[in-house]
């Protein structure tokens, strides 16, 4: 019985010492920053909206692009004329070129180039055909390729559209 009490007392003492040791270690590792407090200033950035084809975009209820700070989100570009009518019906290669031409106009509005693009998402109703012409992108992205996804979809907003390309841009100031 004495031995059991002694062992129990030893365990209790060891536990107490380990807690004490942890507290001492924390006290030694804890430092107090005695420097002057700093003030954090939040910058409120107003979105800058851009419409490539205002009448069409108002009719469908979207903006082609919005810039907030150094980031620009560009809505999916499709092959259409200024009245919103599909162009190059049945010709995915030409539709893709038309998309990039429109995207370039938006980029230029914000003084950007395809070198500033960090994300490109492509939606197509004909992935095998898109893969045939995807090499055209090397003419667009001369220095590096952005991240992104290529997605095969059942349909786009208007049946004649075969491809839609959306971008995200980061412009260092």
Indicate residue ranges for each PLM-predicted region.
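Bacterial Sec-dependent N-terminal signal peptides
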Residues: 1-32
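N-terminal presequence-like segments and the immediate start of the first folded domain
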Residues: 20-98, 105-110, 115, 124-173
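Surface-exposed aromatic
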Residues: 118-120
């Amino acid at each position: 019985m004495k031995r059991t009490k002694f062992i129990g007392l030893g365990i209790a003492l060891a536990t107490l010492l380990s807690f004490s040791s942890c507290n001492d270690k924390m006290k030694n590792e804890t430092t107090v920053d005695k420097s002057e407090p700093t003030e954090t200033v939040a910058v409120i950035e107003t979105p800058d909206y851009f419409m490539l084809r205002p009448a069409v975009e108002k009719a469908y209820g979207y903006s082609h692009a919005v810039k907030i700070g150094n980031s620009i989100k560009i809505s999916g570009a499709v092959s259409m004329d200024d009245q919103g009518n599909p162009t190059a019906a049945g010709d995915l290669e030409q539709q893709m070129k038309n998309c990039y031409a429109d995207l370039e106009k938006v980029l230029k509005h914000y003084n950007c180039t395809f070198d500033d693009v960090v994300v490109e998402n492509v939606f197509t109703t004909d992935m095998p055909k898109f893969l045939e012409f995807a090499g055209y992108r090397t003419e667009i992205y001369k220095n590096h390729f952005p991240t992104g996804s290529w997605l095969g979809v059942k349909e786009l907003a208007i049946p004649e559209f075969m491809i839609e390309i959306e971008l995200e841009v980061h412009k260092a100031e």
